[in-house]
Amino acid sequence: MSQGSATRYPLVLVPGMLGFIRLVLYPYWYGIVSALRQGGATVFAVQVSPLNSSEVRGEQLLARIEEILRETGAEKVNLFGHSQGSLTARYAAAKRPDLVASVTSVAGPNHGSELADYLHKHYPHDSAKGRLMSFLLRIIAALMSLLETSYRGPKLPVDIPASHHSLTTEGVRLFNQ
């Protein structure tokens, strides 16, 4: 077996908004986990709240990191965040740098999301359109939770306004301070 993907510390893959580990038969990290493992890496795809603030998701990630460290005996992990998972990973690394060797951000809204800004402007949470969008997102999150076939932990909280604000330019500006 090739050791081309082996790392000193386990890789922890952190999904973005509405992320999952496996939705029925479709893995979020399609092909990536198996390819990295074939290359010799120790890999964990984790689940955090699909719709919540980067800070809440980050605290959930920290709890999972501590479990992974106990399970593997490793001193640290390498975090690999996709989309909002990048902010989640950055939060965990900032709060507990002693547990995190590196953070890789893939398509992370590290300066905010134009889409989140657009939705904030045109679909305010207290408007009829905003309430409808929140309702639809809650339904989507609930359906995804029912169809998730790999996560076996406690039900994760959903906070759509916090999730949305975390991705706006203003929300990320505050996060980056």
Where would I find each of the regions flagged by the language model?
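Generic signature of intrinsically disordered, low-complexity, basic-rich segments
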Residues: 1-2, 101
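Short, surface-exposed "cap/lid" segments of acyl-processing enzymes
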Residues: 2-41
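Serine-dependent carboxylesterase/thioesterase catalytic core
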Residues: 15, 43, 59-176
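Active-site loop signature of alpha/beta-hydrolase-fold enzymes
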Residues: 19-20, 51, 111
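Phosphate/oxyanion-binding active-site loops and adjacent basic polyanion-contact surfaces
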Residues: 25, 53-58
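Conserved alpha/beta-hydrolase
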Residues: 31-52, 104
